[in-house]
Amino acid sequence: MDERAQRKRHTLLGYGACALAGTLWGTGFYFGRIALDEMSVEAMVLYRFLFACIGMLPVLIRHRARLTPSETRTLLLAAALGVPIQFLLQFHGLVLTTVSHASLMVGAMPVLLAAAAAVFAGERLDWVGWLALCGSTVGAAMVVLGGTRVTTGNETPSLAGDLLVIASLITALGWILLSKKLMQTHSPRVVTAYTIYSGMAMLAILLFGMQLLAPLFHFSAPEIPFTQVSARAWAALAISGLLCTATTTLLWNWGINQVPASRAGVFLNIEPALGSILGVELLGEKLGPYAWLGGALILAAAITLTMRDQETQPAVILE
């Protein structure tokens, strides 16, 4: 296999990995909502990453990284942004707003990623790429708003919840770009494993530290239930950790190591689209013609970016 054919193969596999990651991420809100019926946001995120650490343990044992002091600081910053900060902001926002609102804002992520990659990582996207990204985002908006939804209880959107979700997207941008920088000198699986374990350690220190300090400073710390958690919630947490976190992060990091992050970002729109489709069962939504048209826009954007004969400049392939 010549160099050009091998590069094309890596590019297609990279897009496939990003697409699969976006698909699995799309189930995250569904399984997260199941767990949130029985525990706090903090407990749900903690257990989710505990299962993710279990899934990444073989990688951590088999692959040791030698990081420079500068790389260590970058890794810790990426872990802080990508684990405790992003997930606590996102799911606290989900509690305060509706799934449709949260999914709609996540649909803006590809354009934000493309802009950030152009500014901070020196990546370039031509007008067709920008058009595809914008079309994909419009498609995601049509999917999440293209169904009728009966609001019950306290399920109403709020500015505070929307702003928390937006803040989580900004932190996710930092995690993606910092991870891509680390993967210039380290393999994606090493970066993924060390990021998840470092982020889990930060999350555990934060939550258990709050438990210890709560009696001293007289504030209410989030409870971490265990024995009273149902088998259904444990199954949702295990799937969230093993598939929606460990597997997706590994796939995404490997994928953006093969293709520019600005172009791979279109596959992030699978998340809100699939999340909205799962909402049919979870929230009683009905998908109308606009939703189906939105799905077609997302698919067309993905095909446009992946099938165009354009040379990409991926990061150094280490595997």
Give residue spans per PLM region:
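Hydrophobic side-chain positions within alpha-helical transmembrane segments
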Residues: 31, 89, 112-116, 178, ...
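Membrane-interface helix-cap regions at the ends of transmembrane helices
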Residues: 27, 31-34, 38, 52-68, ...
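Juxtamembrane C-cap of transmembrane helices in multi-pass membrane transport proteins
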Residues: 24-39, 51, 87-97, 105, ...
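Residue-level recognition of transmembrane alpha-helices
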Residues: 22, 33, 45-49, 71, ...
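Specific transmembrane alpha-helical segments of multi-pass solute transporters/efflux pumps
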Residues: 23-29, 57-106, 116, 142, ...
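Hydrophobic alpha-helical transmembrane segments of multi-pass integral membrane proteins
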Residues: 13-17, 43-58, 77, 130-141, ...
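Specific alpha-helical transmembrane segments that line the substrate/conduction pathway
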Residues: 43-54, 82, 87, 91-133, ...
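Juxtamembrane helix-loop boundary signature in multi-pass membrane transporters
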Residues: 1-20, 65, 108-171, 290, ...
